């Protein structure tokens, strides 16, 4: 199974799927449009969250970073007058250093990610959507800014006018992504932000066309027409769709099986189940329910 993932909602589902599927039966293609260089290191926030989840390292309170991590380096950088916009943990920074050293030597992001996965003991395939540079830029009431600046530094507070993915027109799907699209029959679009997490993956050249030949299952990230986390509602409105399951489906396009929460008022064709995943048992229940639905469809 191929899973398309962002960095918060879908890892909660992966927490369950990894317990139910053999490693060779689970591959994850991850959004890279929120990647950026900070303090001399290349950060791939969504890839890192997926890797940490599969390696049982994720901080499940925040769904980013490593559990129990400290921020001694970040704190001392602030003391030195360095305006490091992200509160990077010390162990998390080690991941960034590992990746950045490889990238500076000319290694592609795909191979750097494979090396990181191996070092962490992750057996599942984790593949970036592209090896090219794509950046999510948000036009807001306070100016144009990188998505991480909007969401982390400004807590998603500015009004959003539009969302643009710079570099997307020139970017190509990674070779690993293309290989999985050829091999896998089922594609699961995880419950991540449909605009900034899943949107860039689907917008890569040829991806939507290839998905038409697959069994595509999508889990809405909304519960009761509200995102569980993140600024999805603002971003969906700026993209011209309502912050609802109907809006999610419109953004995702071709779907064979659309799964929404039991509380949803969506009236289109769908399957309903409890999709809120606050605990590992809830992640297991959702994962098991999805696998049953897929096998029966």
Language model feature labels by segment:
Residues 1-49:
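Gly/lys/ser-thr-rich phosphate-binding loops in alpha/beta enzymes
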Residues 19-24, 208-214, 252-253:
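Short, conserved loop/helix-junction motifs that constitute active-site signature segments
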Residues 27-31, 215-222, 257-262:
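Short internal beta-strands
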Residues 30-165:
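Electropositive, gly/pro-rich neighborhoods at or near active sites that engage anionic ligands
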Residues 161-180:
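Active-site glycine-rich loop that binds ribose-phosphate moieties when present
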Residues 228-297:
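C-terminal functional extensions of proteins
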């Amino acid at each position: 199974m191929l899973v398309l993932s962002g960095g918060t909602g879908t890892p909660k589902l992966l927490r369950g799927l990894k317990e139910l599927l053999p490693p060779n039966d689970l591959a994850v293609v991850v959004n890279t449009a929120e990647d950026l260089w900070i303090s001399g290191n290349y950060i791939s926030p969504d890839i890192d969250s997926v890797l940490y989840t599969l390696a049982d390292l994720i901080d499940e309170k925040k769904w980013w970073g490593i559990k129990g991590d400290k921020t001694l380096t970040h704190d001392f950088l602030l003391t030195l007058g360095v305006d490091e916009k992200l509160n990077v943990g010390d162990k998390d920074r080690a991941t960034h250093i590992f990746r950045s050293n490889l990238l500076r030597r000319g290694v592609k992001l795909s191979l750097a990610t494979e090396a990181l996965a191996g070092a962490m003991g992750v057996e599942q395939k984790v593949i970036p959507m592209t090896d090219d540079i794509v950046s999510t830029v948000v036009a807001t009431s306070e100016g144009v800014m990188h998505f991480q600046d909007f969401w982390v530094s400004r807590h998603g507070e500015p009004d959003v006018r539009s969302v643009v993915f710079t570099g997307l027109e020139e970017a190509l799907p990674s070779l690993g992504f293309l290989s999985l699209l050829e091999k896998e029959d089922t594609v699961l679009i995880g419950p991540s932000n449909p605009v900034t997490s899943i949107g860039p993956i689907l917008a890569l050249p040829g991806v939507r066309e290839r998905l038409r030949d697959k069994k595509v299952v999508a889990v809405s990230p909304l519960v009761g027409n509200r995102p569980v986390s993140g600024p999805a509602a603002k971003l969906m409105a700026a993209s011209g769709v309502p912050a609802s399951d109907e809006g999610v489906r419109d953004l995702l396009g071709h779907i064979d099986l659309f799964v929404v929460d039991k509380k949803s008022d969506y009236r289109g064709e769908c399957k309903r189940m409890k999709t809120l995943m606050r605990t590992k048992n809830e992640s297991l229940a959702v994962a098991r329910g999805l696998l049953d639905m897929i096998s029966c469809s």
